[in-house]
Amino acid sequence: PSLLPDDRIQITREMPDWQNAIRMASAPLLDNGFINRNYIEKAIDMVETDKRFIMIADGVIIAHAGVDDGVYSMGMSFLRLPEKLSFNGYMDADIIVVLATPDKTRHLPALYQLFDLLEDEGNISAMRRAQDAHEIARLIRKYI
């Protein structure tokens, strides 16, 4: 099974504040039992306090919390916003990938595949132009 299936990829026309953007991006993982609400709030706390985020490409961040913060199984979700949003005043992003991992190593292969995908600016542009989640999923499946 794919680590990032179509039903965990969202495109929104809304412009929430950054905390709600992380909540929206996390919703598919919460709804499918990969994480609990605590994980989402801890991911928000990390941006607010520790600045422990991973900005992996221009306008693309990975939101995550710790392995002990309410993760039940490994998964990813994806949210594309209509334009870049300021995250706590120190980074701007319009693509949020939420990564949930129950240990410190199992997610690394998927993370490296995601880096490969995002290394090509053309892929990021294609994700920004995509009309629906299926288009984004097709692109991601080539890598992850």
Where are these regions (language model features)?
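Cytosolic covalent-transfer regions centered on His/Cys nucleophiles
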Residues: 1-144
